[in-house]
Design a protein with these regions (language model features):
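Conserved small/polar residues in nucleotide/adenosyl-binding loops
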Residues: 1-5
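Active-site beta->alpha N-cap acidic-glycine motif
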Residues: 6-117, 207, 223
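Catalytic domains of cell-wall/extracellular-matrix polysaccharide-remodeling enzymes
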Residues: 87-187, 191-209, 213-214, 220-221, ...
Length: 234
């Protein structure tokens, strides 16, 4: 059975506090959401080639291949986070009960498959989305009670908005913004229609290495990037 871990709400860093100055080390967190898919294994292969760890905010899948990918993510030292079970906004955000049921279904599945007590979550659409029928503060309060830290992003590859970006454009989108911040949480996708993201990954890692960035998985030492700060919710 999943073991609940209760921690105080995370304090999100402000954008002003996060602006990089001369001599600051850039910490970059590559985060992939919407998988696992047929691209996830390719992404894991590339990360292994460069000895880079990342974070995967996964959705719920019950097929054998997807569950093997959950296990591989954990076994290879990446952070296994949650992105909802269904990834269907109209269902997840319909009510408090619907959100909690979706969350618990994914959390419990990941624990049963991998033994990982995942404590990281990314809201579909982010914590400031305008899609939910229920105030997002309700869901944030629930995650706070569960001891779960949610992460938004402050750098986007652009692959969510369009599949038209080339791999070169995806790299440029990321590199244009990571130079601004001490901590960059990069939004990427490993859904089945994101082949350009896979093609962009190796040159992106090389560009980040060239600028001297540290590429890290989200963990307890990571500065929290949130649009709606968890500690602002009663």
């Amino acid at each position: 059975m999943y073991k609940r871990q209760v921690t105080p709400p995370a304090t999100g860093i402000s954008e002003e506090e996060n602006l990089a100055g001369d001599g600051d080390i850039h910490k970059v967190y590559l985060t992939f959401e919407d998988g696992p898919s047929d691209h996830t294994g390719e992404i894991l292969d590339i990360l292994a080639q460069y000895d880079v760890k990342a974070t995967f905010f996964v959705v719920g899948k019950e097929d054998e291949e997807s569950q093997a990918l959950y296990q591989r993510i954990a076994d290879e030292g990446h952070t296994l986070g949650m992105h909802s079970y269904s990834n269907k906004y109209s269902q997840i955000y319909q009510s408090d009960e619907a959100f909690e049921e979706d969350f618990e279904r994914l959390r419990d599945e990941l624990y049963q498959v991998t033994g990982v007590n995942s404590i990281y979550y990314r809201f579909p659409g982010g914590s400031s989305n305008q899609i939910s029928n229920v105030p997002m503060s309700d869901f944030i309060h629930y995650l706070n009670e569960q001891g779960v830290i949610y992460y938004d992003w402050n750098v986007s590859a652009g692959d969510a908005a369009s599949n038209a970006y080339s791999s070169e454009e995806i790299v440029a989108n990321v590199m244009d913004d990571v130079v601004k911040y001490k901590t960059s949480v990069v939004l990427l996708h490993d859904a089945s229609d994101k082949s350009a993201t896979v093609e962009a990954l190796a040159p992106l890692i090389e560009a980040l290495n060239e600028m001297g960035a540290e590429i890290l998985p989200i963990d307890e030492d990571t500065s929290v990037i949130q649009y709606v700060k968890a500690d602002s919710i009663d």
